[in-house]
């Protein structure tokens, strides 16, 4: 069984015996325990289990104790460390020297002992040695016997832990390409050096003929298939067939296509993570899967010109339920766009929620909307908006039919109610695919995302000579008047899933206007997650050494390693680029 990645907590202490160290032992170890309790009681792994922490076997005052802690962490699958102290300690003697995992240090803000002095000293050592570390220092002075963690410190500890766990969860997993490059899309030209050096992941690839091989040879669970057919007939609404009359398939042909796309889902899932049932059926090799944390399916055009498309498979892999019940989602990219797949993966690992994959299709200005519909935009839509619409697939969680406190949300699977599953199904239909584009047929996914959800749109791009860069746009989904929605939606493909999105504007740079957001977006796709998580993404990017070229996160929420400030404090974007370039990828 593969261990969860853990956070290692390192209580460091003044090494002077005969009174000084002894007086600090309890307070120092209690700081470590309080941080571990905070993380374990607040954060969860993608499977819903509480995040695990490992505390050093003793306080760390000298190098042998630092070495003992390091050995314990190596055996315990520790993916990041947090050093805590209320006092002065010996900086380079007590620091963790691991260069390939993130580090953070919390220096207690008190007057009796100089925790802040140690924090500054050890961060200077980290900078000198080229091992980045995040500095955490409470805004307000605390009493020496105060065991509470201040709110500002909690926020930084949790932001750091979420991002650090994401690095650990990615390491030693795989991106699985099902097929190759789709229609010349740059993101589906998979770059193995990026995955290996920045994420610690490997790349695997199967030809799309693996789907037909498994279908023809019965390499899937036949009992599950029969159960799935019953569930689909009961719960899935086939939508309006908008094809030309000569392209409309017969009822019998559509029945065969439903069988086909259900098998595609089962095979796609089994390729990613394996299925012990296959071993029972005599297919031991196929049963192990590819250990894929994220995958993509090429589809267009070689597959879709002949076979039913991947929309149903992609939709339900990215959704948190199927005929087997509620479960955690997979991360699965349309058109094998690996860079959007990674963008989805970042979002997923930070939130434990499913991801919307969408084309960043159209910028609608207030003037254009007025001309086409006669409607004057107002509220969050007043400056215009973006039409996010994928060519036929999207997680059903993207409907926004789940709720929290009466508001639409996308939530982790362990919070999802059966009634919310039913609401998602009732508000979605699956029209036959547009056969002018998808000659082999299939079934698209059609819904409208509910408005007023805080969301973050993300995209990772590769820039020759620089490497990966990340862009982030926080904003809100919109609910347009029904007639306005239909008028605009019908101008594209009304058989596809639509999300209306208004980014939050700042009045400067790429966020001067909604048009500027669209104009500066780096690719045709975006990954959309529930919540405003831009600050967490910036922290994660700094750990991986990926510069952020565009974001609308308030400056006070940006949390990067302390040595980033040594690259400059006025132009943070430039400092970020130079820090990432100098330090290089996390796993190189």
From Swiss-Prot:
Keywords: Carbohydrate metabolism, Cytoplasm, Fucose metabolism, Isomerase, Manganese, Metal-binding. Pathway: Carbohydrate degradation; L-fucose degradation; L-lactaldehyde and glycerone phosphate from L-fucose: step 1/3. It is found in: Cytoplasm. InterPro entries: Fuc/Ara_isomerase_C, Fuc_iso_dom3_sf, Fuc_isomerase_C, Fucose_iso_dom1_sf, Fucose_iso_N1, Fucose_isomerase, Fucose_isomerase_dom2_sf, Fucose_isomerase_N/cen_sf. Its cofactor is Mn(2+). The keyword Flavoprotein does not apply. It holds the Pfam family Fucose_iso_C. One of its GO terms (biological process) is D-arabinose catabolic process. It comes from the Bacteria. This is L-fucose isomerase. Converts the aldose L-fucose into the corresponding ketose L-fuculose. GO terms for cellular component: cytoplasm. SUPFAM superfamilies: FucI/AraA C-terminal domain-like (SSF50443), FucI/AraA N-terminal and middle domains (SSF53743). Coiled coil: none annotated. Belongs to the L-fucose isomerase family. Mn(2+) binds at residues 335, 359, 525. PANTHER family: L-FUCOSE ISOMERASE. HAMAP family: Fucose_iso (MF_01254). The active site is at 335 (proton acceptor), 359 (proton acceptor). It is an enzyme of class 5 (isomerase). The keyword Hydrolase does not apply. It catalyses: L-fucose = L-fuculose. It comes from Streptococcus pneumoniae (strain 70585). One of its GO terms (molecular function) is arabinose isomerase activity.
